[in-house]
Amino acid sequence: MNPDSPFSIGIDLGTTNSALAFIHHEEAEGSQILSIPQLIDRNLLDELPTLPSFLYCPLEEESSSLLGHLKWETANEHLVGTGARVLGERTPQRLISSAKSWLCHQEGQKQAILPLYAPEDLAKISAVDVATA
C-alpha cells in the first residue's frame, strides 16, 4: 500500500458477484463504485457495477466470436461475468458458478473438476483457476 496514493480501493470477491469501489481522498464525493466492462451477451459489451461470479467455457467455434469482441486483449479462453451467466443459462454444462465455495473443498482447490457435469470433450479446470480467470 502506498500511503501517498490519493486513492483507496475496496474489492468484494463475492460468491455470486464481485465489485470494486474506490475513494479519492482529495475529493468530497465519497466512495464510488467502479463500473466493470464485460461482455453481457453475444456481440454486446457494457459497463456494469458488479461482475457476476460465473465462468463459461465456450465451444471451440464460439470462442473467437465471443472473445474477439472484447476491447482488450486476453489470453483467457474462458468468459467471465454477465455474458458467462447468460450463455451458461443456454448451455449449463459449460457454466461454472460458486467456484469460491469449491476453494474450501479438499478436492476442489487444485484438481481440475469444474464444471462438474461437463461433456467429456471439455477440459475441466480447478476452482483456483476459476477464481483467477
Region roles according to the model:
Residues 2-30:
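Gly/Thr-rich phosphate-binding beta-strand-loop-beta motif of the actin/hexokinase/Hsp70
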Residues 32-133:
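Phosphate-binding loop and its immediate beta->loop->alpha context
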